[in-house]
């Protein structure tokens, strides 16, 4: 990739605009183009965001067209219909997979040869679809996966134990949705297994923590209509890792090819990411219960994915 860091955002709704604002505040990227079906909104947002630039570092922000994707390092997609109260993320697939195909076709027609970062839900399925539609190498098509779920997980444990969330290490794996699960066998706090921090009679509290993490989006949607700050921050973190060639380990929706006993699926797992995309997938030694949970999550996604792709074929 060139030294000049160029990001194109497709989808200027609540998630997209929050992500753009995060990138400005965190000094991520040097050029930031915004695409949306509502052109006036992108013009207004570009103006508004540019007024925040003097408080950060220099950055060119503008209302973009798909032709501007041709030399982008990263295209971030947050477009799609939103999850409504009572809907699961998987319920969105029929509406959003067609939208995604239209977006990917337009981006690829520009000559784009960078990295796709997908946040639209259901993210695991739409990331797989983007890989298929684009023809890009699997390493350069990435989904936000369980990055937000993992952040919620670490924060909830930290609140319970009254420690800094940055000292909690553990991952939510699987679908970014109802079949996700915590890898308790690899969760540590300050270098010690989580079991060293809790008594046997506190296991119920840990189970409650996970349920609150899994269902957090539903609660937020019921109260304010949508979630956007958390996922925007997660996208900004992933963007920073890619553009700055960090080789950071982040829980993302990545393509499994034999990893965890899975094939031909995008699903949430820790991966090393840099400016080439996914460099390596971290295959954790899960216990038997976690292996079964991973299989269940993958099976659920596969069924929905197969049905969704038939609509396009």
UniProtKB/Swiss-Prot annotation:
Its EC number is 1.1.1.27. This is L-lactate dehydrogenase 1. NAD(+) binds at residues 15, 36, 41, 66, 119-121, 144. Homotetramer. One of its GO terms (cellular component) is cytoplasm. Keywords: Allosteric enzyme, Cytoplasm, NAD, Oxidoreductase, Phosphoprotein. The active site is at 176 (proton acceptor). Allosterically activated by fructose 1,6-bisphosphate (FBP). It comes from Listeria innocua serovar 6a (strain ATCC BAA-680 / CLIP 11262). Substrate binds at residues 83, 89, 121-124, 149-152, 227. One of its GO terms (molecular function) is L-lactate dehydrogenase activity. Pfam families: Ldh_1_C, Ldh_1_N. The lineage of its organism: Bacteria, Bacillati, Bacillota, Bacilli, Bacillales. Pathway: Fermentation; pyruvate fermentation to lactate; (S)-lactate from pyruvate: step 1/1. It is found in: Cytoplasm. It is an enzyme of class 1 (oxidoreductase). It catalyses: (S)-lactate + NAD(+) = pyruvate + NADH + H(+). NCBIfam families: L-LDH-NAD (TIGR01771), PRK00066.1 (NF000824), PRK06223.1 (NF004863).
């Amino acid at each position: 990739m060139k030294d000049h860091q160029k990001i194109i955002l497709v989808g200027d709704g609540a998630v997209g605009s929050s992500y753009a604002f995060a990138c400005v505040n965190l000094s991520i990227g040097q050029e930031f183009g915004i695409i949306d079906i509502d052109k006036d909104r992108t013009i207004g947002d570009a103006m508004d965001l540019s007024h925040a630039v003097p408080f950060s570092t220099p950055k060119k922000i503008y209302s973009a067209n798909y032709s501007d994707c041709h030399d982008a390092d990263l295209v971030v997609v947050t477009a799609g219909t939103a999850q409504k109260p009572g809907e699961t993320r998987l319920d969105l697939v029929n509406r959003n997979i067609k939208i995604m195909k239209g977006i990917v076709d337009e981006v690829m027609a520009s000559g784009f040869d960078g990295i796709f970062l997908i946040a639209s839900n259901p993210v695991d399925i739409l990331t797989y679809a983007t890989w298929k539609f684009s023809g890009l190498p699997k390493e350069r098509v990435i989904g936000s996966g369980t990055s937000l779920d993992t952040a919620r997980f670490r924060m909830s444990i930290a609140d319970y134990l009254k420690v800094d969330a940055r000292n909690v290490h553990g991952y939510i794996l699987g679908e970014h949705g109802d079949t996700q699960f915590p890898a308790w066998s690899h969760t540590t706090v300050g270098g010690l297994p989580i079991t060293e921090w809790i008594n046997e009679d506190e296991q119920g509290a840990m189970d409650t923590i996970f349920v609150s993490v899994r269902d957090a989006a539903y609660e937020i949607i019921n109260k304010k209509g949508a979630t956007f700050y958390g996922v925007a921050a997660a996208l900004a973190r992933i963007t920073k890792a890619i553009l700055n060639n960090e080789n950071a380990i982040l829980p993302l929706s990545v393509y499994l090819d034999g990893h965890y006993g899975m094939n031909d699926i995008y699903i949430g797992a820790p991966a090393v990411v840099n400016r080439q995309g996914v460099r390596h997938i971290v295959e954790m030694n899960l216990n038997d219960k976690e292996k079964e949970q991973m299989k269940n999550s993958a099976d659920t996604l596969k069924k929905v994915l197969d049905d969704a792709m038939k609509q396009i074929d």
